[in-house]
Amino acid sequence: MSSSSFSIENVRSQFPALEKRQIFGDNAGGSQVLGTVAKRQLSPITEYLIETNVQLGASYKTSTQSTAIFDNAYKAAAKYINAGIDEIVIGASTTQVFRNLAAALKLQPGDELILTNVDHESNIDPWLHYAALNNATIKWWTPSDLNNPKLDPEQLRSLLTNKTRLVACTHCSNILGTINNIKAIADVVHEIPGALLAVDGVAYAPHRAIDVKELGADFYAFSWYKVYGPHISLLYGSKAAQAQLSSLGHFFNPDGSLMDKLELAAASYELTQAIIPLTAYFGENPKQTWDAIAEHEQKLQTRLIEYLVSKPQITVYGETSTDKAVRVPTVSFTVEGMSSQSVVEAVEAVSHAGIRWGHFFSKRLVGSILGLSDDGVVRVSLVHYNTVEEVDQIIVALEMVL
């Protein structure tokens, strides 16, 4: 994609699935895949399986080719987030890489872990599990404003002690769409010597560039299948933070990189190499490309949120500001007098919109903070290949069913 100008027509032409009449409004659950990653004739995934599907690391020609492709994919992934190649690991999902990370962290009895119930469960349950096994203590960082929950770094400071070992939080809620200030949070966490910050970037990564060095997080994870690629994930771990991890690998294997410590051969070779065309999509100047994406997405969320807040029977959760600096176009709401399930089913009955209802694995947020049942919220989650016209069609459908 050219970073000099944003053409929605050009963007949409690169996603074969968009040829359908379906309006994809459930992108926070998984985005559509670039044609360069999964084109119909000979995708790079298929090419890998046909031409170089052998074990890595051998000396014969096909293995050296396969190893080079795999290594180049790792290099592309590391460059994409401004990390060293020895600071990343590819996994099956963000849930899986966080569980591996929690298993590897050398927890001691009395260590304190600070979690937030704003998060997706993937960045909560692993820490609860291994804290219990190691007699560590859990503290909860709960937002003070339950109507518009945000993670306040100053509130976090009051929870920190010299026993704090790790803070886990989300960069952006997969329900609220609110962007949290990770750099400010990291600065507060690192006031405690040795304390670590683990960030779930899954709901943020489809919308903005990621620079892990600028953010200052010790660990950062996201899923490529929500960033226009195949169903794999990435975990970053700084070299300094890796010193606090044990290796999950076999005793005779090296443990000098995050991949050595945590991969457990879980990186699908054929899917991993698809990272190369995926990252190339953002062009030679990715920052400009992402800036253009943010501008377009602001138009989408402005149209949708302005409509929703104009309806007295609708409650929007999270930021009602349409400013791209504070939120992404993942928008959740409920309708007075209607279940979220019935709203979604009614919208789908009168339109081509694909949206969703529920708690989206952020059950603690939906139940404990928002005070909702498992029926949860209606979520419309948009990305840069959606159009203003599609948003208008969703609005028309909502008008018909409210």
From Swiss-Prot:
EC number(s) recorded for this UniProt protein: 2.-.-.-
Residues reported in the UniProt entry to bind pyridoxal 5'-phosphate: T137, I138, D218, F282, G283
Factors inducing expression: Expression is positively regulated by the cluster-specific transcription factor FGM4 and is induced during infection of coleoptiles of wheat seedlings. The fusaoctaxin A gene cluster is silenced by H3K27 trimethylation by the histone methyltransferase KMT6.
Pfam families: Aminotran_5
Transmembrane segments annotated in the record for this chain: none
Protein family: Belongs to the class-V pyridoxal-phosphate-dependent aminotransferase family. Csd subfamily.
Function per UniProt: Aminotransferase-like protein; part of the Fg3_54/C64 gene cluster that mediates the biosynthesis of the octapeptide fusaoctaxin A, a virulence factor that is required for cell-to-cell invasiveness of plant host. The 2 nonribosomal peptide synthetases NRPS9 and NRPS5 form an assembly line which likely utilizes GABA as a starter unit (loaded on the unique module M1 of NRPS9) and sequentially incorporates seven extender units composed of the residues L-Ala, L-allo-Ile, L-Ser, L-Val, L-Ser, L-Leu and L-Leu, respectively.
Disruption-associated phenotype: Produces fewer spikelets with blight symptoms on susceptible wheat cultivars.
Record's protein name: Aminotransferase-like protein FGM3
Disulfide-linked positions: none
GO MF term (any one): transferase activity
Coiled-coil regions listed in the entry: none
Organismal lineage: Eukaryota, Fungi, Dikarya, Ascomycota, Pezizomycotina
The entry's keywords: Pyridoxal phosphate, Transferase
